[in-house]
From Swiss-Prot:
Family affiliation: Belongs to the QueC family.
Keyword Coiled coil attached: no
Annotated InterPro entries: QueC, Rossmann-like_a/b/a_fold
Name of this protein: 7-cyano-7-deazaguanine synthase
Reactions mediated catalytically: 7-carboxy-7-deazaguanine + NH4(+) + ATP = 7-cyano-7-deazaguanine + ADP + phosphate + H2O + H(+)
Pathway it works in: Purine metabolism; 7-cyano-7-deazaguanine biosynthesis
Pfam families: QueC
Amino acid sequence: MKRAVVVFSGGQDSTTCLIQALHQYDEVHCVTFDYGQRHRAEIDVASALAASLGARAHKVLDVTLLNELAVSSLTRDSIPVPDYDPDAEGLPSTFVPGRNILFLTLASIYAYQVQAEAVITGVCETDFSGYPDCRDEFVKALNHAVALGMARDVRFETPLMWLNKAETWALADYWGKLDVIRHQTLTCYNGIQGDGCGECAACHLRANGLSQYEADKPAIMAAMKQKTGLK
């Protein structure tokens, strides 16, 4: 039996990964992390989506220690979430240092326990906010370290790594779940489900990608298929 663990936040990217994993694996587990993030709604949305989409199990892990160590606008109410600014330089205040290091490591431990061969994460280099822990080289390096440390060939999969946001929308549409992604996920840094606040960087990327996809569906669907190998 093929099993996978999806690092699951209930946002657009991880939900798209879950939808695809449910078609490609016999058994899919979701793991969500409570790190004292700004909006508890993220966890509630993830739980509802995992159940409605048909995940085998959904585990919520308490990692609130990260909140004590990582200062970010996603972990501190006193730090405002910035609006989208295409000219901003440096790491945005929404970067949570060490988050993906911790999440992927803990997801690998969970994968070990449920005998899953893959840990799936929705990180992406094409449309990202400069986060260093979303880079392909980081994921591959950590995968190598985790496999050595566990003496087990767990595989990190990054289905969205080379897709832009329009192509990520196309992938959801390919699996017949575009409306689920649009209306039921929570990507907004201000904690608003669906189309979100429309002002933060996450909402900007999401809305811009959807507009691009709707403007040229055939070409973008074809590009997505070419990158992913889907027929």
